[in-house]
Amino acid sequence: MPRSTGAKLWSTLNKTATRNARRIQRELNRNITKPMTEAFVRNAVKQSAAITAATKRALSGVVSPAEPPRSRGSGRWEEGSWGAGPLAPRRYRIFVPAGANGRRRAPMLVLLHGCGQDTASFAAVTRAAAVAREAGWVVLLPEQSSQANAQRCWNWFKPAGQGAVEAGLLMALIEQACRMHPVAANRVSVLGLSAGGAMALTLGLRYPVRFAAVGSHSGAVPWSATNAAQATRAMRGQRGPDAQAVHALRLGLAGRRPPPLLLMHGDADAMVDFSNATAAAALWMHLQPEGAHPLAVVPARRVQRGMRRAVDVFDWTEGKAPYLRLVRVEGLGHAWSGGAGGHAFSDPAGPDGLKLALRFFLAVGA
């Protein structure tokens, strides 16, 4: 069986890896790569059928446009646009829960949609308003422009050019939202699906001090591609992050840890291979600062509630708090776990992805 992308990443970075990185890699192989590989071998025939079925489910339903989101309870939706220039402004929608005001500022979650989606469809898939209302969070949903990408994918695979411009534009929009709405600026997290997940990780590494936590659902590992062809290979698990880019990221972190990280990914994802999740975990571990207190490895646990899909949860903790969490969803294709029915890239049978994310973000202090 070929090595995982995570293992390839460490092989590529071997010459520049520190002793700390090598120790963490051994932990990664022992606690994620090896048990997962053994599990995949035991379930090879079952997984092949599951991938086919999951892909059909992910592509069924409505992609976009969807009906504009409406608040069916307290709180309100607002919409607008931000930015100018050759890449065109970006539309956005923002949900503000009741009770959030200048004296009672709320944490904010930035949700980045995947290819082919828009803010309305992604709000519907994730049930953003209902979950945010219950949790008391502001939710900001930026929308990619079809002028910037014909499929409305965030350009995570162009890190030195258009992708960097988009990351800067998104960061400016986030800061504007913090100024214009009752947001606790030190409690901003970002989470995305697919291309949005890769862009969320990109934002977390470009602007580490601005995010309390970051998350990717079914996203590619960032800095693994510089064009669309390379992006396709990365999504298949055939490319890892560029060693020079990773070295630059380490320098940019200047001795800081990257923000706490949540990774959610289905093991039946035929569009973005699950190995991207292990590669992203390995990247985060490699970027731990020299001399930092080592992360503690928590034994993997399996969770299943009722008839929902089972998940395997892998945690690394900093002190008593989780720092990195990888959630493998059994039988999930390229779709939002626990999403609303009737939409593409949404699997109602999985555990609620947005609730899982908010639980993690709250646990790390976001």
Residue locations for each model-derived region?
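Hydrophobic beta-strand anchors of alpha/beta hydrolase catalytic cores
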Residues: 109-111, 261, 326
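A domain-start/cap signature at the N-terminus of enzymes
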Residues: 1-108, 120-121, 191-195, 199, ...
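Charged catalytic carboxylate motif
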Residues: 165, 169, 276, 352, ...
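Serine-hydrolase catalytic machinery in alpha/beta-hydrolase-like enzymes
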Residues: 2-16, 34, 88-90, 100, ...
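Alpha/beta-hydrolase-fold catalytic nucleophile elbow
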Residues: 191, 215-218, 264, 329-330
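Active-site-adjacent mobile loop/cap segments within catalytic or ligand-binding domains
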Residues: 326-339
